[in-house]
A protein has these predicted regions:
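Mid-chain, well-packed structural core segment of small domains
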Residues: 60-100
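Short, glycine-/small-residue-rich phosphate/pyrophosphate-handling segment
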Residues: 110-131
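Structural/interface elements that position substrates and couple domains in central-metabolism enzymes
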Residues: 17, 21, 38, 48-51
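Short hydrophobic/aromatic-enriched beta-strand-loop microsegments
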Residues: 30, 47-58, 126-129
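Short, acidic/small-residue loops that bind anionic groups at enzyme active sites
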Residues: 95-115
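Short internal beta-strands
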Residues: 28-37
Length: 131
């Protein structure tokens, strides 16, 4: 499955720790991430990550396009609720696309862990049928 990982700057360490803890699950899937987040994940876990541009430079738009084309199966977007990009898709745009295309999305650690465990159990295999 294709898993997208995005984290605002204040959440990058949290994303790094999540990926270290669940490396054994992520290893079985294709990982996509915005530029800086992807580099952090690669450096700390050794996982192969297909990196978009940095979020502010268009990486979130690249992710949005892949969601719209139903090429992403799970999104984990650890966002800083106090941070807002004006004129960028950000979490609101990504959430809207995920809702439109039935892509599971986690925006906090608790939901991210639940999605990763569901992914490992095969609970999200129905996504394969959609592609």
């Amino acid at each position: 499955m294709n898993v997208a990982l995005v984290a605002h700057d204040s959440k990058k360490t949290l994303m790094e720790n999540l990926c270290i803890a669940y490396r054994h699950i992520l290893l079985k899937h294709s990982i996509f991430a915005t530029g800086t987040t992807g580099r952090v994940i690669e450096d700390s876990t050794g996982l192969t990550v297909e990196k978009y541009l940095e979020g502010r430079l268009g990486g979130e738009q690249q992710l949005a396009i892949q969601i719209a084309h139903n090429d992403i199966d799970v999104v984990i977007f650890l966002c800083d609720p106090e941070f807002e990009y004006v004129g960028e898709p950000g979490i609101a745009g990504i959430l809207r696309l995920c809702d439109t295309h039935n892509v599971p999305l986690a925006s906090n650690l608790a939901t991210a862990e639940a999605l990763l465990l569901a992914l490992d159990r095969g609970d999200l295999n129905w996504r394969e049928i959609l592609r």
